[in-house]
């Protein structure tokens, strides 16, 4: 039997929780059985803890020899316990990684993280670069890749009229100087296009070239898919416009940012850092532009023909359809079960 462990998610507005609940829905559609309690969204810390704990304690009693149990990582303090209980029951554990605590948050050392992950039988990493990092640091489990996060939504992108220059660029996410200081510098290099910003915390008076910014405020993801204003979606993190720096920026070399999937569902070709792990996916599928620095973006957009853009947009719509159907999670789980 194919199983998964649901839990409490503190609301569904964050990208991380959206990715996890989407994967639960895909597994449910594949007739996987939830061995935990019913999914809940309590924001109260005590209720969240109690419901997740109750589901964790229930799970081992529902597992049998030969079962496959899918866990979404991190599961924090419960992860090793659930893996050990599953193995005692004769089940195999498949892990889908969402976040590595030894990178951005430094919640674990690399050694602690690998030791924890080695309780799994099979790990689905975000991409080939994350897979290699796990191998290089001593991960003993079998490894596969996701490719990109799926993005479920009943909403569809609104068809746009033919796009004309100058192109506009959309950025969605945390907009404060602490998280993404590059937003306050990039205006220096913007002359002929606009940046449309979606999210909270943008301090427009601190931004250079502020006349090129349109601050749209926070918009729910389903609404953004239907109403996104822009021609490209920007994937960039850190303090610098020249490269992606800091813990958040450097993590792009291994991580699949969930916002990339949101942009694709909006039918927006992607602009992404050339060294980002997802840059390979963007190049291989012809769904955007990979840049070394945002300083060169003005020139690149000015030289991109409307025909080239139309082809990118067509390819982006095709990938977006796959994301809406859970294609990548389905494929990764099927491969995991076949290899175990």
Regions found by a protein language model. Give the residues of each.
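N-terminal pre-catalytic "stem/leader" segment of glycosyltransferase-like enzymes
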Residues: 1-90, 273-278
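Membrane-proximal helix-turn-helix segments that form the acceptor-binding/catalytic region
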Residues: 57-64, 85-89, 104-123
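Alpha-helix capping/helix-boundary segments
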Residues: 76, 129-131, 270, 277-278, ...
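A short, active-site helix/loop in glycosyltransferases that binds the activated sugar's phosphate group
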Residues: 105-108, 119-143
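Conserved catalytic-core segment of nucleotide-activated headgroup transferases in glycan assembly
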Residues: 152-229
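Nucleotide-sugar-dependent
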Residues: 225-266, 272-280
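A short acidic/histidine/glycine-rich donor-binding loop in glycosyltransferase catalytic cores
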Residues: 285-291
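A charged, aromatic-enriched C-terminal amphipathic alpha-helix characteristic of glycosyltransferases
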Residues: 292-299, 305-340
